[in-house]
Regions:
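N-terminal export/assembly segments and adjacent metallocofactor-ligating motifs
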Residues: 1-240, 244-309, 320-321, 338-339, ...
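N-terminal leader/propeptide and maturation segments of large enzyme subunits in energy/redox metabolism
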Residues: 66-82, 229, 235-348, 430, ...
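Glycine-rich phosphate/diphosphate-binding loops that line cofactor/substrate pockets in enzymes
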Residues: 84-101, 157-165, 331, 352-366, ...
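Flexible, glycine/charged-enriched surface loops at secondary-structure junctions
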Residues: 98-102, 238-242, 365, 397-404, ...
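Conserved short loop/turn motifs at secondary-structure junctions
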Residues: 104-111, 339-347, 369-377, 408-411, ...
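Extended redox/cofactor-interaction regions of prokaryotic respiratory oxidoreductases
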Residues: 117-186, 191-196, 222, 292-297, ...
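Glycine/threonine-rich phosphate-binding loop and adjacent beta-strand/alpha-helix elements that clamp
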Residues: 158, 519-544, 554-555, 559-561, ...
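Long, contiguous, secondary-structure-rich segments that constitute the structural scaffold
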Residues: 376, 551-595, 686-699, 703-795
Length: 795
């Protein structure tokens, strides 16, 4: 029997719509779904590998438990019920003896399981994600938008590309990493839109750029601050947006490094109220902004955006106060194109050229991604500097061609599904004091490196159970040498892995569980692109091999065993329908068949039907302390940063911060660039993918290669103070001189069909070279993009 099955690829975050042809239980065809509102029929090679992945002989098929020493490779099969009972019993034992914080569940990129993982952690007794790589992926940017806008959204996915007149693709190559974004950028260009690309390596989309800015990794905030300075110096900013919807007009206390309050200047002020002070041009006197009612204390206030005023305090002394806008502008004055050029290695005239394109072609939107604001020593402040640059550009907020607010994060982290409001315990996150922003924003987890330390030392508390779903710890995190050691520690009493394959981490597990591929399951999450914001209802196309189960099955069955009253569902379909009813006004009597027929559904609880300028219509609000967009954020110093506005800091390792180390390791290393055929560490064992990029490699500049007598295709060592890997040199003019770039994949798996070797977790893994120390002060981001290394011929 032949049938067409509409589903969704999960091989990367793009999550394209797919139509699979299935004949007698066998996948015989793969095509893009032309009716999918986001991918519009587009697919890449990963989706076309569905049949190969589904039928791959190396797939895990049955639950197994270890019968020899960890890593010895001796296993015996047992049932799912036995496996789940064993895990749950151990979790309950540990919770009773040590507390819920000693049980850690882990996930990878969370393409379909964020909310349910969160709910299980709440069931265990500690809210948030116990372990996820969010310290370098997505959350640094989401968190800075939360601080700035009072709304959590990802600027890269919040861009109305097709209606923009100019686009800055910043630390991103969407042709490879977010094809739907790349498609929309190209559509804008066909309509006359201009493209600027910021990247240390000239890749795909850079060939279409009006201006290409080849930047030193880790210095993105210096570029953003320079562009902001040019906008302010030339008065190209949007004064109305800044004056009406941001806290830029608020006055700054000159001695205390905070915003002035009514209590500072009015003896009759309510001491418990946080009322901010502006200078009212209509009365030539102070006025007060009241966030609790989102209005001023009097009618007809004309806040002055840029100025300096003498204010008399309650003590009778006079202080000179500038507006928050002027405070930031004063800091920016040092960031001339020439100064930014010295820092970023971008010629000053190229910076000016980019500025002129942005100003001359509005609306201009900025599309920053991992390289710009998530994987560096200054990640959060880089994100803030780019976000405020976007605000200054004034296209902008919830308008055609600008930034669009997306309800996905409101849905994903709503307490209805996460149960986070039912569980206290932020202080039970490792790293709570060291990296307050990371561990205290919602959706956060333990700071990852602290988990490895806690397993080893059992301080400040022991970690006794570690369950990893869809993540390979040895391929995912920095300095895996340490992780490999602690996973073999007797202090860790139970280590569980659920995956497609016998990964390097799975080889060290006590229990391994087989995971279902997207062609074999019907789970999914909301799409992150905002226009349209949808959830796709995927169908099961084929039966999984053996007894493989979907991830939601694990979360559900563990939840039933630990806190059954929070887990009333008996199937993945029932869980999906519950979400539709919570967030999508799905009829109570409508079942799974009706959902499948509907195919694509928009959320209703957050204004998903595109209504522009929602903030002006009162449909959404900025949930900051001031109920304004916060250019000046008093939360930032609380979280460990040096200023309430964005500042530049040199990378933790580099020619200026560690000059002696730079002499020994004279290249700036950036890691993690996407490749067409792979996603993170996945798919190097799939022939259709591996044939495109058969060998691990490093990109380097041809002049650097000539100086070191390294030829294109030659095996080389890449070394950092942390370790060494062996890869092939890819020599060209594409890479900035003095920079070397390693892609994300670690080539851990062999490809038997092509007779190509695998390199396990420690031979070609870029993370071997990356420090575990969190160099971003409040968030603990590590410098995956912008640390030091050297390169030499391999023996």
């Amino acid at each position: 029997m032949k049938k067409k099955v509409r589903t969704m690829c999960h091989d990367c975050h793009t999550k394209c719509g797919v139509v699979l042809t299935v004949e007698d239980g066998v996948i015989t065809g793969v095509e893009g779904d032309p009716n999918h509102p986001i991918s519009e029929g587009m697919l890449c090679t990963k989706a076309f590998s569905a049949k190969e992945i589904h039928e791959h002989p190396d797939r895990l098929q049955y639950p197994m438990r270890r019968i020899g020493a960890r890593g010895e490779g001796k296993w015996e099969r047992f049932t799912w019920e036995e496996a789940l009972d064993t895990i749950a019993d151990k979790m309950k034992e540990v919770i009773e003896q040590y507390g819920p914080q000693s049980v850690v569940t882990a996930q990878g990129t969370g393409r379909a399981c964020n909310a349910w993982h969160y709910r299980l952690q709440s069931s265990i007794g500690v809210p948030g994600f116990a372990l996820a790589p969010t310290h370098v992926c997505l959350l640094p940017n989401l968190s800075q938008t939360h601080v700035t806008w009072g709304r959590m959204f990802h600027p890269h996915e919040a861009c109305d590309y097709r209606r923009a007149k100019s686009i800055v693709s910043w630390g991103s190559n969407p042709i490879r990493s977010r094809q739907h974004s790349g498609l929309r950028i190209l559509d804008s260009m066909r309509d006359g839109g201009k493209l600027i690309v910021v990247d240390p390596v000239f890749r795909d989309i850079a060939s279409k750029a009006e201006v290409f800015l080849q930047i030193r990794p880790g210095t993105d905030s210096a570029l953003a601050l320079c562009l902001s300075n040019l906008i302010i110096q030339n008065k190209e900013y949007g004064a109305e947006l800044l004056t009406t919807w941001s806290n830029a007009p608020f006055l700054v206390h000159p001695e205390e490094g905070r915003l002035l309050r009514e209590t500072d200047i009015n003896l009759d002020a309510d001491p418990d109220a946080d009322h901010y002070v502006v200078w009212n041009s209509n009365t030539d006197a102070p006025a007060y902004w009241l966030p609790e009612v989102k209005s001023y204390n009097i009618d007809d206030v004309g806040p002055v955006l840029d100025g300096k005023f003498t204010i008399t305090t309650v003590s009778g002394t006079n202080i000179e106060c500038v507006t928050a806008f002027r405070e930031y502008a004063n800091y920016l004055e040092q960031f001339t194109p020439e100064y930014a050029s010295e820092i970023t290695w971008i010629p000053a005239d190229r910076i000016v050229a980019a500025y002129e394109v942005m100003i001359s072609n509005k609306p201009c939107i900025l599309s920053p991604y991992l390289g710009a604001c998530m994987m560096s020593s200054n990640a959060v402040q880089s994100g803030r500097s780019i976000t405020i640059l976007q605000i200054l550009l004034n296209p902008p907020v919830d308008e055609p061609g600008g930034i669009l607010f997306n309800p996905i994060w409101d849905v994903t982290f709503d307490p209805i599904i996460t149960m986070a409001d039912q569980v206290p315990g932020q202080h039970l996150r490792l790293g709570y004091d060291k990296y307050p922003m990371y561990t205290q924003v919602y959706a956060s987890s333990n700071w990852p490196a602290s988990i490895w330390d806690a397993i080893e030392t059992e301080e400040p508390w022991p970690i006794k159970v570690l369950a990893c779903i869809a993540t390979d710890l040895l391929g995912c995190y920095e300095h895996p040498q340490k992780i490999h050691e602690v996973l073999q520690s007797n202090n860790l009493e139970l280590f569980v892995v659920m995956d497609y394959w016998m990964t390097p981490s799975a080889k060290l597990a006590d229990i391994i569980l087989p995971a279902a591929h997207w062609s074999e399951r019907c789970m999914g999450d909301e799409e992150v692109i905002p226009d349209p914001c949808i959830v796709t209802i995927p169908q099961i196309a084929v039966d999984p091999p053996g007894e493989a189960k979907d991830d939601w099955y694990f979360w559900r069955e563990m939840g039933k065993r630990i806190k059954p009253e929070w887990w009333p569902w008996d199937s993945t379909e029932e869980m999906y329908l519950a979400r539709l009813k919570w967030f999508y006004d799905w009829p109570e009597d409508a079942g799974w068949d009706e959902a499948v027929e509907k195919a694509y559904i928009q959320p209703t609880n957050a204004g998903a039907t595109r209504i522009f300028k929602q903030h002006e219509k009162g449909l959404i609000e900025f949930k900051t302390a001031s109920r304004k967009i916060e250019i000046y954020s008093e939360a930032m110093p609380v979280y460990g940063y040096d200023a309430p506005f964005p500042t530049y800091a040199e990378p933790a390792e580099g020619p200026l911060t560690t000059p002696e180390l730079y002499q020994e390791y004279p290249f700036i290393l950036t890691t993690g660039a996407r490749d067409y055929p792979f996603y993170h560490s996945a798919w190097t064992n799939i022939a259709r993918q591996r044939v495109i990029e058969p060998w691990p490699y490093v990109e380097m500049n041809d002049e650097d290669a000539a100086r070191l007598q390294i030829s294109d295709g030659e095996w080389v060592y890449v070394q950092s103070p942390r370790g060494q890997i062996k890869v092939k040199a890819r020599v060209s003019k594409a890479t900035l001189k003095g920079v070397i770039s390693l892609p994300r994949q670690n080539y851990k798996d062999d490809c038997k069909e092509l007779n190509l070797p695998g390199y396990d977790w420690d031979q070609a893994n870029p993370n071997i070279l990356i420090p575990t120390d969190g160099s971003d002060p409040g968030f603990g981001c590590t410098p995956m993009r912008g640390t030091l290394a050297r390169i030499s011929k391999a023996e």
